[in-house]
């Protein structure tokens, strides 16, 4: 199964990992085999509410990896083009956390969905203190930029 996931990722990102593709590759449900019943109600509801308000919202990262492997994820993260303030207004129980990386925790019972805004590649707007320490880098961007700046290819998968 792991080899299947590796082959799928290689087909998505191609062989040249240095090239950034601005257009997402959409894989049909019949091809990726993710069982939607394995996605938590809280993650589905978080995405649905944002999408109903006109925002893009996707389950992202390790949860997508686990879903591809047929394993029920323990944690669900959502990436969106809504700002933290917009997410907070849209969701009933949502709390903005963090200073440097502003995220929103959306609470459903005992489950927390971590919701982040797509981040930009361009760091020219990053504010630093006198010692060069980054004070704030909440520079929002497009989905392709968010995918390109993630630390591992697997974290750049959106569902």
Cite the ranges covered by each PLM segment:
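Catalytic cores of the polymerase beta-like nucleotidyltransferase superfamily
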Residues: 1-159
